[in-house]
Design a protein with these regions (language model features):
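General secondary-structure edge motif
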Residues: 12, 64-65, 120, 139
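Flexible, glycine/small-residue-enriched loop-and-beta-strand segment within the central core
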Residues: 70-81, 85-154, 162-164
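Gly/Pro- and small hydrophobic-enriched strand-loop and loop-to-helix capping segments
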Residues: 167-168
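A glycine-rich, hydrophobic loop/mini-helix early in the fold
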Residues: 57-77
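Terminal amphipathic alpha-helical/low-complexity segments used for targeting or macromolecular assembly
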Residues: 1-63
C-alpha cells in the first residue's frame, strides 16, 4: 500500500486538485475495498476475526465495533486514538484525514466524506477530485442517516440529528 508521505498524498493533503486514477490511489482503494468486503462477509458475532480485519483496514484508528456493510476509500486516513463505535452501513470517504475524538458514536447509515468533485463535467469525467479534512470532536454522536461533508469540524459534545447534513 502507498504511504501518506508519497507525493500524490501530499498533493491531496495540501488541498490541491488531484487525479483519482493515479496508480497509487487505485491500488490503495482496491486493497481497502477487498478488506471491507472481507469484513462485511463476517457475521458480527465473529468479533476476533472482525477486529483483526479492522486493524488492518484502519491502522490509525481504534474501533470498538463496526456494524454490517462498512465502507471506506482508503482506511489509512481515518484516525481515532480511542475506540469509535459504528453502526451498520457507515461510509467514510477518506481521501483526506478524517479524525475522531474520544467517545464518538456513529449510528446507522452515516456518510462522512472528505472529497469533492469539480462542477465542470469534463473535469469530473477526467477523474479530478479535491479533498479537505474532517474533524469530529470528543463525545459526539452522529445520528442515523446524517452526512458530514468535506472540511467540516464538529465540536466536542455535539449531537448531529438524524438526516442532517453538516457542511462546516
Amino acid at each position: 500500500m502507498t504511504k501518506p508521505q508519497d507525493t500524490i498524498w501530499q498533493q491531496i493533503y495540501s488541498g490541491q486538485w488531484y487525479q483519482t486514477h493515479h496508480p497509487q490511489l487505485v491500488e490503495a482503494r482496491e486493497l481497502a475495498k477487498r478488506l471491507c468486503n472481507e469484513l462485511n462477509q463476517l457475521p458480527v458475532s465473529e468479533v476476533t476475526k472482525r477486529q483483526a480485519l479492522i486493524s488492518q483496514l484502519l491502522p490509525n484508528a481504534k474501533v470498538a465495533a463496526t456494524g454490517n456493510d462498512f465502507a471506506c476509500d482508503y482506511g489509512i486516513n481515518i484516525y481515532a486514538e480511542t475506540p469509535v463505535i459504528m453502526g451498520d452501513r457507515v461510509v467514510i470517504l477518506d481521501a483526506a484525514p478524517v479524525s475522531f475524538g474520544a467517545n464518538v458514536k456513529i449510528e446507522d447509515a452515516v456518510v462522512i466524506t472528505s472529497l469533492t468533485h469539480p462542477l465542470e463535467a469534463a473535469k469530473r469525467k477526467a477523474g479530478w477530485q479535491q479533498a479537505s479534512p474532517v474533524k469530529i470532536g470528543d463525545n459526539v454522536i452522529l445520528c442515523e442517516g446524517c452526512t458530514v461533508l468535506p472540511g467540516a469540524v464538529i465540536p466536542a459534545g455535539a449531537v448531529i440529528e438524524p438526516g442532517k447534513v453538516v457542511t462546516r
